[in-house]
């Protein structure tokens, strides 16, 4: 059984989909850290996707294989997670360990600099359902107790 943690390992950023106040979807991207259950993003409150999450605490996180890796554009590996979103307060006991993991993943000073900026905040994106596609006819739902496993499709898309 494949787990999301292995599948998301090569990715450093996720494409975010959020819902704007005008009712239209908005796409952007953000670096992320995944702990095996939750996708964490550290984004500025000035950014449109942060404002959207604050109003409608839901987001999609989309991960897609680089185009240069495959010979057939239609066979790109991709994972789409539909998530509930929640801001993690800087004062919470979760904040420091998650940010430490972020720093280890992205070895460099940029994240340290951003941590000092008060408009940047940590958000937890908790998957409630998702899909993974690895080529023609190789599609799975995301499921399991912690919503972190590939589950063979049975004809039901798993959407709520």
List where the protein language model places each region.
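A general structural signal for well-ordered secondary-structure junctions
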Residues: 13-14, 59, 108, 112
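Structural motif
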Residues: 38, 58, 129-131
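Short, structured beta-strand-loop surface elements
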Residues: 48-105, 120, 127
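Conserved hydrophobic/aromatic beta-strand scaffold that supports enzyme active sites
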Residues: 27-31, 80-82, 120-124, 139
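C-terminal edge-of-domain segments
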Residues: 100-101, 105, 109-160
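An N-terminal domain-cap segment
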Residues: 1-54, 62
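Surface loops and adjacent helix of pleckstrin homology
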Residues: 44, 64, 135-137
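Catalytic micro-motifs at enzyme active sites that drive phosphoryl/nucleotidyl and oxygen chemistry
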Residues: 19-21, 28, 68-71, 109-114
